[in-house]
Amino acid sequence: MELHILEHRVRVLSVARPGLWLYTHPLIKLLFLPRRSRCKFFSLTETPEDYTLMVDEEGFKELPPSEFLQVAEATWLVLNVSSHSGAAVQAAGVTKIARSVIAPLAEHHVSVLMLSTYQTDFILVREQDLSVVIHTLAQEFDIYREVGGEPVPVTRDDSSNGFPRTQHGPSPTVHPIQSPQNRFCVLTLDPETLPAIATTLIDVLFYSHSTPKEAASSSPEPSSITFFAFSLIEGYISIVMDAETQKKFPSDLLLTSSSGELWRMVRIGGQPLGFDECGIVAQIAGPLAAADISAYYISTFNFDHALVPEDGIGSVIEVLQRRQEGLAS
């Protein structure tokens, strides 16, 4: 398998809900006029707490500093795994890279963020951790770094500085999980038809906020949750929304897999997770991979979210609770 280090240098930000008005114009520009900003990596995820943005340096320039904007300190690099076989299962998601990428990085104390899209899975690592990433994964993967759009082979010698890293550390924190009742769909869209849904998209993202109060509460099982993720990365669009929100969009423009599968969410974290802890993704992806359960995984500024097939949510909760009990004992 090949591991590609993409050219994007990504910043991770949080826009507080009360300050959304200040960012409506630049966000609309990034959403609908990417050529104007030259942004090639744009992801916006709405949660009950805030709006998380993952944007490259060109996109970051569009966002003015303010009291409503929090910026994670690190610059993140984007990794992508490609398999030589063209028969990859469309919705395997984070499960297919849990053992080969996520677990080894957790063992070497590399903090990762995940962004699963309709098309692929992006793994974000801090720029300063790249040497450890390469050293850790070089045996498993042919590693290439994109330079000027062309893949250049990376050897382990290129990454010898700062390695090895201490391999012992505290046991992973056991984070609580919740499973809201929403049913989600993972969709794509031909970029040429994006203008046709622009009005609806703007309404859903910026003006539709009649969320049940329990969605943002600390109750163990919120009945529903505000969650909408849109990404436009290298010309490909991916949208995650709940089935009720999907009804607002013209059905003939949104494309999904032939099965039209619906997904349920597992939300990870009781308190904001931060960016320094390692192994959070592995805590979820590992057990799902062992049980051969497909999952999309989306990290946000405060919490993590896994999407699993609707008909398997009961067994997923059981698997993860068993894992939690094992870690806690």
Swiss-Prot record:
Binding site for L-arginine: 111-112, 274, 280-281, 300-304
Primary location recorded for the protein, binned into one broad class: cytoplasm
Variant or mutagenesis effect after changing residue 207 to S: No effect on arginine-binding. Loss of homodimerization. Decreased interaction with the GATOR2 complex which constitutively activates the TORC1 signaling pathway
Post-translational modification, as annotated: Phosphorylation at Ser-14 by AKT1, promoting the interaction between CASTOR1 and RNF167. Ubiquitinated by RNF167 via 'Lys-29'-polyubiquitination, leading to its degradation, releasing the GATOR2 complex. Ubiquitination by RNF167 is promoted by phosphorylation at Ser-14 by AKT1.
Effect caused by changing residue 126 to A: Decreased arginine-binding. Constitutively interacts with the GATOR2 complex
Result of altering residue 175 to A: Decreased arginine-binding. Constitutively interacts with the GATOR2 complex
One GO-annotated biological process of the protein: negative regulation of TORC1 signaling
SUPFAM superfamilies associated with the record: ACT-like
Effect of residue 90 to A: No effect on interaction with the GATOR2 complex
Disulfide bonds: none
Resulting phenotype, residue 276 to A: Decreased arginine-binding. Constitutively interacts with the GATOR2 complex
Compartment annotation: Cytoplasm, Cytosol
Outcome when changing residue 278 to A: Decreased arginine-binding. Constitutively interacts with the GATOR2 complex
GO molecular function, one term: arginine binding
Effect in UniProt of substituting residue 121 to A: No effect on arginine-binding. No effect on homodimerization. Loss of interaction with the GATOR2 complex which constitutively activates the TORC1 signaling pathway
Annotated phenotype, changing residue 213 to R: In 3KR mutant; abolished ubiquitination by RNF167
Tissues where the protein occurs: Widely expressed.
Mutagenesis / variant outcome for changing residue 277 to A: Decreased arginine-binding. Constitutively interacts with the GATOR2 complex
Gene3D superfamilies named in the record: VC0802-like
Residue positions where Phosphoserine is found in the record: 14
Residues annotated as domain ACT: 72-138, 260-321
InterPro entries per record: ACT-like_dom_sf, CASTOR1_ACT-like, CASTOR1_N, CASTOR_ACT_dom, CASTOR_fam, CASTOR_mTORC1
Role: Functions as an intracellular arginine sensor within the amino acid-sensing branch of the TORC1 signaling pathway. As a homodimer or a heterodimer with CASTOR2, binds and inhibits the GATOR subcomplex GATOR2 and thereby mTORC1. Binding of arginine to CASTOR1 allosterically disrupts the interaction of CASTOR1-containing dimers with GATOR2 which can in turn activate mTORC1 and the TORC1 signaling pathway.
Family under the similarity heading: Belongs to the GATS family.
Assembly behavior: Forms homodimers and heterodimers with CASTOR2. Interacts with the GATOR2 complex which is composed of MIOS, SEC13, SEH1L, WDR24 and WDR59; the interaction is negatively regulated by arginine. Interacts with TM4SF5; the interaction is positively regulated by leucine and is negatively regulated by arginine.
Name of the featured protein: Cytosolic arginine sensor for mTORC1 subunit 1
